[in-house]
Design a protein with these regions (language model features):
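N-terminal intrinsically disordered, cationic/polar leader segments
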Residues: 1-112
Length: 112
């Protein structure tokens, strides 16, 4: 488990979900891509034009963020201001951008 308090974890993980939603909203307004974002508590589901999905959800007991896409599932822990994959050390937004680009069929970039 991370060195975060529960309150800090919730604040940081909520910030991630909100940043993703804001990016999707901006893309819709700018007619970049039509991704449907549906948030229920700590789960955010992104539905792409081809009906494929990416799911980002919080895991409060573990202080992790999980990302699931067609390519697989990934677990992230907060360290040094970033969400880092527990297996390969990659950064969350880079992985989300890669997976969204693959499923969206065009370059898409998420930032925190």
């Amino acid at each position: 488990m991370s060195g975060l308090s529960d309150a800090e974890y919730h604040r940081l993980s909520d910030r991630v979900l909100s940043a993703i939603e804001q990016t999707i909203d901006r893309w819709l307004q700018e007619d970049v891509i039509d991704i449907d974002a549906q948030r229920t508590g700590g789960l955010l589901e992104l539905v792409f034009p081809d009906r494929s999905r990416i799911v980002v959800n919080t895991q409060p007991p573990l202080h992790e963020l999980w990302l699931a896409s067609r390519a697989g599932g990934y677990h992230y822990r907060h360290a040094d201001g970033l969400w880092i994959d527990t297996r390969d050390g990659s950064e969350f937004y880079a992985a989300l951008s890669r997976e969204a680009s693959a499923q969206g069929g065009r370059p898409l970039r998420f930032e925190g």
